[in-house]
């Protein structure tokens, strides 16, 4: 096992430029047909992917905040599902435009001053508020490495970079309970194995009170909204900053959460 993974881990650990902003890492196919398919691509065999999936799943379950392990799990288990999501985007005018233009979300692409100047209640202002209140940054999303198709690599990168948008849309904080609720919504929306795994096994770390609230109120709400809303990857969020968050929720059929979960863990 160690022998099979050693070349991958060596390239993973020694990969230059891992701290570059997301906007500087375009996901575009090589024109010469040789070498990596996109920036940071690490080609792996099916067996190597299986070993990486098993190891990353164990680490992600042990520590849900190991976003690097969650990222590896998503890339090594979601190939078929990513094709379905890609096809959904291709069939939607807004989604097709996203696939064509490949927008990225990072501090180098966001005009934070403009977002701050937007009216209260707008998507852009509320997204910025979410980042500030929860002390998170869009620059923490790892670049895609193990998806052997450059367009599918962009799809999963886009999913990662709009994750905080989903927190904003659903009104969920970044504590454990909030993350699990978002994972249930994402599991229904995307069908990605890592989302399903996180949705089912994430609650293991919850206390009795939070678990009861999750099962009785928050999971049914997240599942219902996930089924009712159109594919959230088809939203060109960067062109909707000025739209009212309330209006966007109404457009998507997303209702208010049944309770405030900021103080729960």
Swiss-Prot record:
Question: Which pathway does this chain act in?
Answer: Cofactor biosynthesis; ubiquinone biosynthesis
Give the EC class as a word: lyase
The tissues where this chain's protein is expressed are given as: Expressed ubiquitously, but at high levels in liver, lung and pancreas.
InterPro entries registered for this protein in UniProt:
Coq4, Coq4_euk
Q: Which GO terms describe its biological process?
A: ubiquinone biosynthetic process
MF terms in GO: 4-hydroxy-3-methoxy-5-polyprenylbenzoate decarboxylase activity
Where do the annotations place Zn(2+) binding? Answer: 163-164, 167, 179
Record Pfam families: Coq4
Keywords of the record:
Disease variant, Lyase, Membrane, Mitochondrion, Mitochondrion inner membrane, Neurodegeneration, Phosphoprotein, Primary mitochondrial disease, Transit peptide, Ubiquinone biosynthesis
Q: What is its EC number?
A: 4.1.1.130
Q: Give, from the UniProt record, the effect of changing residue 184 to R.
A: In SPAX10 and COQ10D7; likely pathogenic
Localization terms from the record: Mitochondrion inner membrane
User: Which membrane topology term applies here?
Assistant: Peripheral membrane protein
Q: Changing residue 145 to C: what effect? A: In SPAX10; likely pathogenic
Q: Give first and last residue of the transit peptide.
A: 1-30
Which coenzymes or cofactors are required? Zn(2+)
Q: Does the keyword Phosphoprotein apply?
A: yes
Consequence recorded when altering residue 124 to V: In COQ10D7; likely pathogenic
Gene Ontology annotations for the cellular component aspect, listed alphabetically: extrinsic component of mitochondrial inner membrane; mitochondrial inner membrane; mitochondrion; protein-containing complex; ubiquinone biosynthesis complex
Q: What does this protein do?
A: Lyase that catalyzes the C1-decarboxylation of 4-hydroxy-3-methoxy-5-(all-trans-decaprenyl)benzoic acid into 2-methoxy-6-(all-trans-decaprenyl)phenol during ubiquinone biosynthesis.
Q: Which family does it belong to?
A: Belongs to the COQ4 family.
This protein is called Ubiquinone biosynthesis protein COQ4 homolog, mitochondrial
What organism is listed for this UniProt entry? Homo sapiens (Human)
